[in-house]
Curated annotation (Swiss-Prot):
Listed PROSITE patterns: SHMT
Name this protein carries in UniProt: Serine hydroxymethyltransferase
Species assigned in the record: Gloeobacter violaceus (strain ATCC 29082 / PCC 7421)
Family that this chain belongs to: Belongs to the SHMT family.
InterPro entries for this protein: PyrdxlP-dep_Trfase, PyrdxlP-dep_Trfase_major, PyrdxlP-dep_Trfase_small, Ser_HO-MeTrfase, Ser_HO-MeTrfase-like, Ser_HO-MeTrfase_PLP_BS, SHMT-like_dom
Keyword Amino-acid biosynthesis: yes
Gene: glyA
Pathways involved: One-carbon metabolism; tetrahydrofolate interconversion; Amino-acid biosynthesis; glycine biosynthesis; glycine from L-serine: step 1/1
Top-level EC class: transferase
MF terms in GO: glycine hydroxymethyltransferase activity; pyridoxal phosphate binding
Example of a GO biological process term: tetrahydrofolate metabolic process
Length: 426
C-alpha cells in the first residue's frame, strides 16, 4: 500500500502533500547519489505492515514480550536469508543502521581507549571508522591510513607500517567513497601479523558482493557489517555477519541490550523481502549492470576530459576531481541540481578544500540502474554532466540538459503502480 494513498491524503493532507512532492522529485530527477536506491513495492509494503505495532526485545524464541511467535518467524526468515546470501554462519538483522551495526561491533570487541585502524575520512573512509567527531574517534584511539598519492589506491605499505607500529586491536576495511576492488586477503594478512580483529564495512558494495561481482569478505574477516539499502536495494537498516558463532553471540548481546532496545520488526520484515529478492537470479544481472553502467559513465566522463580519482571505477561509484574544470564540489552539486541531477559533493584524497566545500563530486549507478537505464543511457548521462560542468554559464546548455534529463526520466518510469500524483502547490 503506497504511503501517499487516498487514506493518508484524507487523514493528513499536509504530510501527504510533502510525500507526493518527494515522489515527484524522485520521478523527475536522475538519482546519482551512490548510497541511494529505489526499493521494490514489496519492500515498502512489508515496512508499512502491522508489524510496526509489535515490541520484540531479544532474539527469536528468546523474547521479553509475549505474542512474538509471528514476528519470530519473520525475523528468522531474514536471518536465514542473510546467511545464505553472504555465506555467513551467523547474522544479526536488528541494527537500525550501519552506524549502529559498527557501534555494536566496537562494544563487543573493544575496550575504551583501544586502538583502531581505518581509512582516513578524506580519502574515502567513513565517520564511524574513527572520525574525531564520531564516538568511534572519541572513545577509541583512532589511527588512519590512506591511498597512494599517485595511484589513489589503498597504500598497503602504509597500512602494514601503521599496524606494526601501533598494534591496533581492530583494523577496518570498507569505505564510503573508494571506487576500486578491496583486497580483503591482504588486509587479513596484516591483521594476522599484528593479532588484530578485522572488520569489513561493506555498506556500499554489499549488493555487488552477494551477486559475485566483488570479492566476498566473509572468508577473510572476523566480522562484516553493512547497511541493507544502497546496492542491496532494501529498507534503511543495518546487518552484522560473521563466520564465527562465538563472536556472533557477542555481537547479539552488543546489539541488545548493549546499544539498542526493541528491534524494528516491520523493517526486519522489509529486510527479509529484500534478501529474498537478492537471492533471485535477476539480482545477479542487476549487480552486473550496476558495475557496467558505472564504467560506461566513467569512460564517457574521461573521454570528455574530466579527471576521475584513481582513473576510473571497479564498482558502483566514481569521484570526479573538479580542479581540472576550476569548480568546487559545492558548486558542481548546485550545477547538477539546476538540471535535475542529484549528486553529492565529496572530498577527494589530499583535498585542498574543506569538507564543506570539497574538490570532488561523487556519482553512482545503483538507483538509475534499478530504473532500467543501461550503458547507452549512462553514456548519455556522462555527456549531460560534462556539458554542464564545462559550460556552467551557458543557458542553452542548461535547457538542453533539462530536456535530456526529462526524456530519460519519462522513458524509464519510477513506481508506475503509484499512478500519477499531482502535488499541491505551496
Amino acid at each position: 500500500m503506497p504511503v501517499s494513498d487516498d487514506l493518508l491524503r484524507a487523514t493528513d493532507p499536509l504530510v501527504a502533500g510533502w510525500i507526493d512532492r518527494e515522489l515527484n522529485r524522485q520521478r523527475s530527477h536522475l538519482e546519482l547519489i551512490a548510497s541511494e536506491n529505489f526499493t521494490s513495492a514489496a519492500v515498502m509494503a512489508a515496512q508499512g505492515s502491522v508489524l510496526t505495532n509489535k515490541y520484540a526485545e531479544g532474539l527469536p524464541s528468546k523474547r521479553y514480550y509475549g505474542g512474538c511467535e509471528f514476528v519470530d518467524a519473520v525475523e528468522q526468515i531474514a536471518i536465514d536469508r542473510a546467511k545464505a546470501l553472504f555465506g555467513a554462519a551467523h547474522a544479526n538483522v536488528q541494527p537500525h543502521s550501519g552506524a549502529q551495526a559498527n557501534a555494536a561491533v566496537f562494544l563487543a570487541l573493544l575496550e575504551r581507549g583501544d586502538k583502531i585502524l581505518g581509512m582516513d575520512l578524506s580519502h574515502g573512509g567513513h565517520l564511524t571508522h574513527g572520525s574525531p567527531v564520531n564516538q568511534s574517534g572519541i572513545y577509541f584511539e583512532a589511527l588512519h591510513y590512506g591511498v597512494d598519492p599517485a595511484s589513489h589506491r589503498i597504500d598497503f605499505d602504509q597500512v602494514r607500517e601503521l599496524a606494526h607500529a601501533h598494534r591496533p586491536k581492530l583494523i577496518i576495511c570498507g569505505y564510503s567513497a573508494y571506487p576500486r576492488v578491496i583486497d580483503f586477503e591482504c588486509f587479513r594478512e596484516i591483521a594476522d601479523e599484528v593479532g588484530a580483529y578485522l572488520l569489513a564495512d561493506i555498506a556500499h558494495i554489499a549488493g555487488l558482493v552477494v551477486a559475485g561481482v566483488h570479492p566476498n569478505p566473509i572468508p577473510h574477516c572476523d566480522v562484516v557489517t553493512t547497511t541493507t539499502h544502497k546496492t542491496l536495494r532494501g529498507p534503511r537498516g543495518g546487518l552484522i555477519l560473521t563466520r564465527d558463532e562465538a563472536l556472533g553471540k557477542r555481537f547479539d548481546k552488543a546489539v541488545f541490550p548493549g546499544t539498542q532496545g526493541g528491534p524494528l520488526e516491520h523493517v526486519i520484515a522489509a529486510k527479509a523481502v529484500a534478501f529474498g529478492e537478492a537471492l533471485q537470479p535477476e539480482f545477479k544481472t542487476y549487480a552486473a549492470d550496476v558495475v557496467a553502467n558505472a564504467r560506461a559513465l566513467a569512460e564517457r566522463l574521461t573521454a570528455r576530459g574530466l579527471t576521475l580519482v584513481s582513473g576510473g571505477t571497479d564498482n558502483h561509484l566514481m569521484l570526479v576531481d573538479l580542479r581540472s574544470v576550476d569548480l568546487t564540489g559545492k558548486q558542481a552539486d548546485l550545477l547538477m541540481s539546476d538540471v535535475n541531477i542529484t549528486t553529492n559533493k565529496n572530498t577527494i584524497p589530499f583535498d585542498p578544500q574543506s569538507p564543506f566545500v570539497t574538490s570532488g563530486l561523487r556519482l553512482g549507478s545503483p538507483a538509475m540502474t534499478t530504473r532500467g537505464l543501461g550503458t547507452t543511457e549512462f553514456g548519455e548521462i556522462g555527456e549531460i554532466i560534462a556539458n554542464r560542468l564545462t559550460q556552467p554559464t551557458d543557458a542553452r546548455v542548461v535547457a538542453d540538459c533539462l530536456e535530456r534529463v526529462a526524456s530519460l526520466c519519462t522513458r524509464f518510469a519510477l513506481y508506475p503502480h503509484l499512478g500519477r500524483v499531482v502535488a499541491p502547490v505551496g
